[in-house]
A protein has these predicted regions:
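Amphipathic alpha-helical/coiled-coil segments positioned at domain termini
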Residues: 377-388
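Short helix->loop/beta-hairpin flanking segments within DNA-binding domains
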Residues: 31-81
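Conserved catalytic core of nucleic-acid polymerases
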Residues: 1-44, 54-57, 111, 283-376
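Helical catalytic core of nucleic-acid polymerases
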Residues: 67-86, 231-347
Length: 452
């Protein structure tokens, strides 16, 4: 039997989201029950954001922690990323909840093993959970502040403040409209029983109904950025290969476009040469997704030795855990090292920017279709969409890819994602398997998103 300490996973945590909608009435009864005395408005605001986030965190997983700074330096109440103006006053509220036995508190410390400071972890106590269990979450909409920032600008890796421009304002409006669509859309794996996925590096991912999509950019490289923020953006190759044919949008037939088919075209464009990568791998070790990501890892590596050692060490992330080092080395030699056109890229210690291009293509697609409210999702370098909107998605994407990758005379072809049975029912093709084939977790999420 493991000790209580062994069972706690402090890495399974997320920071408090200061951009929640504290005007929500979801937890008002809970707060009234726990705090009978009237407090000042400053206290009430900080109490509400903390209880609200503890509630959302518990809904996501009762094993998940919230990280919170117990230092005044951890707060900037004037930040554009803090529309509720949450200050270090939150520390006082945290201490009060600890005193009243409403949260479990694990103080932050300096980790000598990783040489990093770890923030304090908190989690709802049984007393607080008893109150949460009385709450019925009405929907996943309107949980965020109306001025929530979806464009995140960084300066040398640190989130920074910035003055608005026409470009940033345009990006923000597109992201706001897209996130309204995301908040109303169920994107899920119907037969998955638990809402926790485990990556190849053992990091846990929660299939959260409260996802928000961000566009992260470096302020000095504003033309480049990465789409992220949601559970599906955190999936590694190991997980993706297991669920790519099961991802489903709104309980309907779902398809996807695989952008890795144009990875060689991208390499050709940036190298001004003709790079070819065999899409149908005859390797008993590597499929095409694995091959492309190993190629990119080879580009980022400094030497062939460090590349091979890193691949073998991280082989589970690439879904290669069942193969020996010699088998992996042979596959790499046959399908990467033997490709002469790749030699100009290998072992340069550089990222060639493929993920930036994928995010740019996706963002341009989003900007084209938000007005017609078609839900689309970027999962690694695959774009998922409802099958019944395939023609409009392909039309838009062909124009975007033509412009971004300088491709001529090509035709996009979508692949079917969901491996569940469907039949045509009215205008939409909906899942018709018996509910017994779907997890209770998924059926509950259907109700939450109004898909009964």
């Amino acid at each position: 039997m493991k000790s209580r300490t062994d069972q706690l996973d402090f890495d399974f945590s997320r920071p408090i989201d200061f951009q929640r909608n504290i005007c929500s009435e979801i937890i008002d009864d809970c707060i009234s029950e726990l705090f009978k005395e009237d407090k000042n408005s400053l206290f009430n605001k900080h109490l509400k954001i903390l209880i609200l986030e503890l509630y959302y965190c518990w809904i996501e997983s009762d094993m998940q922690f919230l990280t919170v700074s117990m230092s005044k330096r951890g707060y900037n109440s004037k930040s554009r990323y803090n529309p509720n103006n949450i200050s270090s006053y939150l520390i006082k509220v945290v201490k009060l909840l600890v005193k009243n036995n409403l949260i479990n508190f694990h103080a932050g410390f300096y980790d000598h093993r990783t040489k990093k400071s770890r923030l304090t972890r908190i989690k709802s106590s049984k007393m607080l959970i008893n109150q949460f269990e009385k709450i019925k979450l009405p929907s996943t909409q309107n949980i965020n502040h109306r001025k929530k920032e979806y464009l995140l600008l960084y300066n040398k890796g640190k989130l920074c403040e910035y003055k608005d421009s026409y470009d940033t304002q345009e990006i923000r409006v597109i992201l706001e409209n897209y996130n309204k669509i995301v908040s109303k859309t169920l994107f899920d794996v119907p037969n998955l029983k638990r809402n926790i996925l485990v990556r190849g590096d053992n990091k846990k991912i929660i299939i959260s109904p409260f996802s928000s999509v961000f566009y992260k950019k470096e302020i000095e490289k504003i033309d480049k950025g990465l789409i992220g923020g949601c559970w599906w953006n955190k999936i590694d190759l190991h997980l993706f290969l297991n669920i790519k044919k099961k991802l489903t949008i709104n309980n309907q037939k779902t398809s996807y476009i695989d952008l890795t088919k144009y990875f060689a075209s991208y390499l050709s464009m940036i190298s001004n040469s003709n790079v070819s990568i065999q899409q149908r791998s005859f390797s008993g070790v590597l499929d095409y997704d694995q091959l492309c990501y190993l190629i990119m890892k080879g580009f980022r590596s400094q030497t062939s030795k460090s590349f091979l050692n890193s691949v073998y060490k991280e082989r589970k992330k690439f879904s290669l855990q069942s193969f020996t080092l010699s088998e992996i080395r042979e596959a790499i030699n046959n399908h990467i090292m033997a490709n002469q056109k790749l030699q100009n890229f290998l072992y340069k210690g550089k990222d060639i920017g493929w993920n930036f291009v994928v995010s740019k293509i996706f963002f341009k697609l989003v900007s084209e279709i938000t007005k017609i409210k078609v839900p689309v999702f970027l999962v690694r370098d695959k774009i998922y969409f409802p099958t019944d909107r395939e023609s409009i998605i392909l039309e838009k994407l062909e124009k975007i890819i033509f412009y971004e990758l300088n491709l001529n005379n090509f035709k996009l072809h979508a692949e079917k994602a969901s491996d569940f049975n469907f039949e045509k029912k009215g205008f939409f093709g909906r899942l018709v398997k018996s509910d017994i084939d779907f997890s209770q977790r998924y059926l509950d999420n259907k109700k939450l998103f109004g898909l009964e």
